[in-house]
Amino acid sequence: MGSACIKVTKYFLFLFNLIFFILGAVILGFGVWILADKSSFISVLQTSSSSLRMGAYVFIGVGAVTMLMGFLGCIGAVNEVRCLLGLYFAFLLLILIAQVTAGALFYFNMGKLKQEMGGIVTELIRDYNSSREDSLQDAWDYVQAQVKCCGWVSFYNWTDNAELMNRPEVTYPCSCEVKGEEDNSLSVRKGFCEAPGNRTQSGNHPEDWPVYQEGCMEKVQAWLQENLGIILGVGVGVAIIELLGMVLSICLCRHVHSEDYSKVPKY
């Protein structure tokens, strides 16, 4: 009966560590995505915000360590090596404490992140240059076109751009242009566009722009909240797997009475 219980515990621990390994790969992939994505609002933030870049490196580091721990846990469970199981438990405890600490720091710095985000976008709009090729500008054009918004708080944010407001005709940001429901084109127009049929009108007045009037702040924050929900779900899932792994490793470790290093696989 006892040996059967140990065998069940051993293979359950192996299964949990396999899931743990996969979740570690997901966390690592998320960190790589933050650094590599060049076509969404994440690109705007990570290019200008050292905090987000640092967070991406933390995700990559935690993901890599989690995968390593999952691998070591599988070896320790299958071969019933007591020292590996004890080391595995200690590392799991440290990772769990680090995750809780990082989550708390992120939660209490949400206000600072939102403020930093607004400053980044406002500066980007003010310094936008239609004649310059810039990946950051392209990313913001993509956001405005896909989210169907204009500016940060409202389209009036674009009145801070000197190049745009010095145009003699009615000119507006191309990516802000209102599109019909039937227009499902994925291409994004960049730079500034002149409104048709306004050659005789003097001055560039924002009220005449055929653009979305709603700012991107609320929509982007909603998008971030949705993605944060995914991150939170993954984090909770990892924490549950970690706790189960800790419990199972202790149970198995208690039943392994003697150290037998001959069970450790030779590579």
From Swiss-Prot:
The record's listing under Gene3D superfamilies reads: Tetraspanin
Changing C74S: what effect? Strong decrease in the expressions of CD82 and EGFR on the cell membrane
Q: Can you summarize the PTM annotation of this record?
A: Palmitoylated. Palmitoylation contributes to oligomerization and surface expression.
Q: What is its main location?
A: membrane
What start and end residues bound the annotated signal peptide? none
Ranges per topology, Cytoplasmic: 1-11, 73-83, 251-267
- PROSITE patterns assigned to the protein according to its UniProt record, in alphabetical order: TM4_1 (PS00421)
Where found, per UniProt?
Answer: Cell membrane; Cytoplasmic vesicle, Phagosome
- Residues with an annotated glycan are N129, N157, N198
> CDD domains, from UniProt?
CD37_CD82_like_LEL
| Segments on the Extracellular side according to the record's topology features | 33-53, 111-228
Q: Name one GO cellular component term.
A: phagocytic vesicle
Tissue expression notes: Lymphoid specific.
What's its membrane topology?
Multi-pass membrane protein
Q: Where is the lipid attached (S-palmitoyl cysteine)?
A: C5, C74
Q: Which InterPro entries match?
A: Tetraspanin/Peripherin, Tetraspanin_animals, Tetraspanin_CS, Tetraspanin_EC2_sf
Spell out where the chain crosses the membrane: 12-32, 54-72, 84-110, 229-250
Q: Please describe the quaternary structure of this protein.
A: Forms homooligomers. Interacts directly with IGSF8. Interacts with EGFR. Interacts with VEGFA and PDGFB. Interacts with ITGA4. Interacts with ITGA6; this interaction reduces ITGA6 cell surface expression. Interacts with ITGB1. Interacts with TLR4; this interaction inhibits TLR4-mediated signaling pathway. Interacts with TLR9. Interacts with PLAUR.
Similarity comment text for this entry: Belongs to the tetraspanin (TM4SF) family.
Q: What does this protein do?
A: Structural component of specialized membrane microdomains known as tetraspanin-enriched microdomains (TERMs), which act as platforms for receptor clustering and signaling. Participates thereby in diverse biological functions such as cell signal transduction, adhesion, migration and protein trafficking. Acts as a attenuator of EGF signaling, facilitating ligand-induced endocytosis of the receptor and its subsequent desensitization. Mechanistically, modulates ligand-induced ubiquitination and trafficking of EGFR via E3 ligase CBL phosphorylation by PKC.
> By what name is this protein known?
CD82 antigen
Q: What does the record give as the organism's lineage?
A: Eukaryota, Metazoa, Chordata, Craniata, Vertebrata
